[in-house]
């Protein structure tokens, strides 16, 4: 199958990292970008320089109102209304919706009016079907025009939860994600009417926050529906987060048995999705890691054979953006079958 042509709506953190991933891994061909808040020259600058992932490894320039990357021409639009973006004209059959604004089927479907065939929302959705690579792609329905890639945290938790649940059975569990700062947070204390704590200075605080990531696992693994919930701590780091899953198991297992099962899955059916390490790692060691989830064998503990705490890392930008592309490519293959 030839490379799938894609468009990116919203050239923020995820939009730009999706683009970088498409170049590094050569998985998809970005033919168009839309962002009404960034002019072309600023787009070049933001793509070229990144405080977390470094300088872009390639040639970036502009010509005739288009972005030129490694000699390839990419159409650039600045439409606020997604229905006005000429995706079809640009040849973008699949669109990554990464603004964080158009996260429902109704809103994201506006891209279809512009000529896109399918839309992947790079965020959880209230009504679009959610897919997590390595977990529930077998449930993909080609009739769906709009789907969600869930959240970065769900992409970390779900593969690990699947391995544990399939082998040992999860009776119930609580998840905590220690999550890096994101763009919605404040540099200094500022107004945040819906989340007072979320308005406090990101660099100065550990901020408790809500997350639907654990509950969302129940949507992609129906047998876990109602068995998991969780919360988050936002911490003063710029990238890489870590999931702590504390679970009660149906079938008793030693921690060594759990480690062995996760390692087995990481080398087989979840290779490339779930990683495994026994090294004495810290968060910076995972910047640029393309796995959805990397199990930290040395960090977990068990109280007894039925009650365990499991730890798994994730680059919440790079790994997640990789999965956006993987999902698009999977959809394109299924849609053309």
Swiss-Prot record:
Domain of life: Eukaryota
Catalytic function, reaction form: D-glyceraldehyde 3-phosphate + phosphate + NAD(+) = (2R)-3-phospho-glyceroyl phosphate + NADH + H(+)
Catalytic-site annotation from UniProt: 152
InterPro entries: GlycerAld/Erythrose_P_DH, GlycerAld_3-P_DH_AS, GlycerAld_3-P_DH_cat, GlycerAld_3-P_DH_NAD(P)-bd, Glyceraldehyde-3-P_DH_1, NAD(P)-bd_dom_sf
Positions with a binding annotation for D-glyceraldehyde 3-phosphate: 151-153, 182, 211-212, 234
UniProt cross-references to Gene3D superfamilies, sorted A to Z: Dihydrodipicolinate Reductase, domain 2, NAD(P)-binding Rossmann-like Domain
Pathway assigned in UniProt: Carbohydrate degradation; glycolysis; pyruvate from D-glyceraldehyde 3-phosphate: step 1/5
Primary enzyme class: oxidoreductase
Record's keyword terms, sorted: Cytoplasm, Glycolysis, NAD, Oxidoreductase
Marked site (Activates thiol group during catalysis) residue numbers: 179
Family, similarity comment: Belongs to the glyceraldehyde-3-phosphate dehydrogenase family.
PANTHER family (alphabetical): GLYCERALDEHYDE 3-PHOSPHATE DEHYDROGENASE, GLYCERALDEHYDE-3-PHOSPHATE DEHYDROGENASE-RELATED
Alphabetical list of NCBIfam families matching this protein: GAPDH-I
Name used for this protein in its record: Glyceraldehyde-3-phosphate dehydrogenase
Species per Swiss-Prot/TrEMBL record: Mycosarcoma maydis
Lineage, top ranks: Eukaryota, Fungi, Dikarya, Basidiomycota, Ustilaginomycotina
